[in-house]
UniProtKB/Swiss-Prot annotation:
Its main location: nucleus. GO terms for cellular component: nuclear speck; nucleolus; protein-containing complex. Residues 196-357 are annotated as: Interaction with TNPO3. One of its GO terms (biological process) is RNA splicing. One of its GO terms (molecular function) is zinc ion binding. It is found in: Nucleus, Nucleolus. A zinc finger (CCHC-type) spans 160-177. This is RNA-binding protein 4B. It comes from Rattus norvegicus. The keyword Cell membrane does not apply. CDD domains: RRM1_RBM4, RRM2_RBM4.
Length: 357
């Protein structure tokens, strides 16, 4: 079946008139008129060629009509995939085999399979029925409709014409232009002719970029990389210092004169013990200063050479707070000898208390 296009039809033309005009050259299967053009389906290809030759520019109702083969593409696929082809088979031999079922537009052999483009869909169906699972040059070939989306339309399949760029001398798979229209990279071919291309510098573990951030590449994974212990400690100290400045900047500064000398020093011993000063006795103050200046590690820690200890009573010992201040105020009126003896007892109690450590 051949579909013919009829253009420039006059308004007076009818379907019956067009059908009777084309039936002079062959059997008409279908005739349709759409406004000022129409389509006629003729069963025989030879009859269609005769109708085109005789009716093109035929004057109908005073108007010259145009008759030519329809150029619309058939919705049915005409591309066939032929598998299991003999390695000695050529394009001409395979084309001649399929031309037994209809005109072949293109025939390409790729290794042990090939693609054949038939002119008509009905010829492609007949070729599948007649050639599938048949012997050809010692091999049973398989013929089926192609499911490939690449080059669904025939043309530009030989080495003489690339279907991507349109130039001659190379296959489409060797075309320097990719599917997006950009020129492909020929790094391997360049290396073979002019030497290897220098590869970009690759950083090692723990190294930084050899360019500044303003001119170098951005490291999007910098926050996830493992940093050294020194870098983490320095960052933590800096953040803690900044946090202290921000949160305590509104507090008034403490004068150094209001802080005791033994607390204002930067080398304060956290384990050092000091007695509360007694304002009623100068000897007690001197003894307390001497005891404070003495080192803890310079004491005689042998229990055999110690003097006899006098355990304090329940009410004696160290005290802090308001009660201890009241006891110190009342002790100001006591005898200095009693205060000295009490100090010696408290000093021994302090020594016995911390000697276990």
């Amino acid at each position: 079946m051949v579909k013919l296009f009829i253009g420039n039809l006059p308004r007076e033309a009818t379907e019956q008139e067009i059908r009777s005009l084309f039936e002079q050259y062959g059997k008409v299967l279908e005739c349709d008129i759409i406004k000022n053009y129409g389509f006629v389906h003729i069963e025989d290809k030879t009859a269609a060629e005769d109708a085109i030759r005789n009716l093109h520019h035929y004057k109908l109702h005073g108007v010259n009509i145009n008759v030519e083969a329809s150029k619309n593409k058939s919705k049915a696929s005409t591309k066939l995939h032929v598998g299991n082809i003999s390695p000695t088979c050529t394009n001409q031999e395979l084309r001649a085999k399929f031309e037994e079922y209809g005109p072949v537009i293109e025939c390409d052999i790729v290794k042990d399979y090939a693609f054949v483009h038939m002119e008509r869909a009905e010829d492609a169906v007949e070729a599948i029925r007649g050639l599938d699972n048949t012997e050809f040059q010692g091999k049973r070939m398989h013929v089926q409709l192609s499911t490939s989306r690449l080059r669904t339309a025939p043309g530009m399949g030989d080495q003489s014409g690339c279907y991507r760029c349109g130039k001659e001398g190379h296959w489409s798979k060797e075309c320097p232009v990719d599917r997006t229209g950009r020129v492909a990279d020929f790094t391997e071919q360049y290396n073979e002719q002019y030497g290897a291309v220098r590869t970009p510098y690759t950083m090692g573990y723990g190294e930084s970029m050899y360019y500044n951030d303003a001119y170098g590449a951005l490291d999007y994974y910098k926050r996830y990389r493992v940093r050294s212990y020194e870098a983490v400690a320095a960052a933590a100290a800096a953040s803690a210092y900044n946090y202290a400045e921000q949160t305590m900047s509104h507090l008034p500064q403490v004068q150094s004169s209001a802080v005791p000398s033994h607390l204002n020093s930067t080398s304060v011993d956290p384990y050092d013990r000091h007695l509360l000063q007694n304002s009623g006795s100068a000897a007690t103050s001197a003894a307390m200063a001497a005891a404070a200046s003495s080192s803890y590690y310079g004491r005689d820690r042998s229990p055999l050479r110690r003097n006899a200890a006098v355990l304090p009573t329940v009410g004696e010992g160290y005290g802090y707070g308001p009660e201890s201040e009241m006891s110190q105020a009342s002790a100001a009126t006591r005898n200095s000898l009693y205060d000295m003896a009490r100090y010696e007892r408290e000093q021994y109690v302090d020594r016995a208390r911390y000697s276990a450590f």
